A protein has these predicted regions:
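Trp- and acidic/polar-enriched beta-sheet ligand-binding modules for extracellular glycan
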Residues: 1-81, 90-91, 101-180
Length: 180
């Protein structure tokens, strides 16, 4: 509630903090574990040349190419990556990667690694990460859903690392799963 005395207007009101969601009633449901509204957040990335990395976890499809995560062209060997803290720990059931509006600058391939980590872990450390989704080919301006490609008997996770090869843009990343 905001009160203005005696009169006037408010152009913008921004509230900052951490999302606290009650997961108790959703133990057997498949929910989006990665969404901003569920408490998901970006922990780190190696490049974010264009756009806003947090848009990657937003609702709906991207409105423009700037409404997503895009990296600069990579001239050196390697790949680009982003690490996402899930809203809560869970068992991954389905992964969705949306390349909306990325037509000539979408990644050729992607893979996902996941881990169950403690707060304050080093996002650059490779020792925690295990392969959840092996390399998959992506296409322009499309929603890519992966279910059967996900590693079996993976166990619970609370952080994921999206790897894109070699570079490019992703509009949305969604991780669906069961809350533990």
């Amino acid at each position: 509630r905001i009160n203005i005395f005696p009169d006037g207007g408010v152009a913008r009101l921004r509230l900052f903090g951490d999302v606290q969601r009650d997961w108790a009633n959703q133990k057997n449901d498949i929910v989006e574990l990665s969404a901003l509204r569920s408490g998901g957040s970006v922990l780190g990335y190696n490049d974010a040349h264009y756009g806003d990395v947090n848009a990657l976890l937003s609702e709906g499809r991207g409105l423009t190419m700037g409404d997503g995560w895009e990296t600069r062209r990579r001239r050196e060997p390697g790949n680009d990556w982003i690490v996402v803290q899930l809203g809560t720990s869970g068992f991954v059931d389905e992964i969705e990667i949306d390349t909306a509006h990325f037509k000539g600058n979408f990644p050729d391939k992607c893979s996902i690694q996941a881990a169950l980590v403690e707060k304050g872990f080093d996002v650059n450390s490779a020792e925690n990460w295990k392969e959840l989704l092996p390399k998959q080919r992506l296409s322009a301006n499309a929603i890519h859903k992966f279910k059967k490609e996900i590693a079996n008997d993976f166990g619970p996770v609370n952080a994921i690392r999206l790897n894109i090869y070699p570079d490019g843009g992703v509009s949305r990343l969604r991780i669906f799963g069961k809350v533990i």
